[in-house]
Amino acid sequence: MRALFLKDAETAPAIQTVEDSAAGAADAVVSLRAAGLNHRELWIAKGQYPGMTLPATLGADGAGVVETVGSDGDQALSGQEVVLYPGLGWGDDLRFPSAGFGLLGMPGPGNIAESIAVPADNLFPKPTHLDFAQAAALPLAGLTAWRGLTTKAGLREGEALL
């Protein structure tokens, strides 16, 4: 498949042919219709993102259609339009991520590609009032905003922010 691939910090990202990401029993394969770009991809390309292992397929935000679902996943997802939640292994404490937390594109393959295998639990219905490009722009920005409000600003249920 084709994907936005970064060989090293000295080479510009380029569209290349890469192997399909391996899907496990709890995964779903999503055919991407749109992927969002974040400043994170620029930092990665400049070698300024800590913990990044190169070479890598870039991208954390995306929306598409579920192609297949692994044997342990919800088969009703097949054919559904979805948004990818980019967080992997947040843990049980909503205030901060676990030590094993990661994002799509770090350490595994990113989603600026024709398709990606992700945990089926990381898929959410695409809002019908959004097209794929609009939906793809939401996940990581939304997670960043939510975390800023809840963990940094300390906003709690029942409180409001203006």
Each PLM stretch: what is its role?
Residues 14, 26, 60, 97, ...:
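Exposed loop/turn and edge beta-strand positions of beta-sandwich/beta-sheet ligand-binding modules
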Residues 10-15, 39-41:
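Short N-terminal binding/cap micro-motifs at the start of the first secondary-structure element
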Residues 40-45, 93:
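Cytochrome P450 core scaffold surrounding the K-helix E-X-X-R motif
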Residues 86-162:
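NAD(P)H dinucleotide-binding glycine-rich loop of Rossmann-like/cofactor-binding domains
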Residues 21-35, 48-91, 107-110, 117, ...:
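Glycine-rich beta-strand-centered segment in the early N-terminal region that forms part
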Residues 1, 80, 158-161:
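Nucleotide donor/acceptor-binding cores
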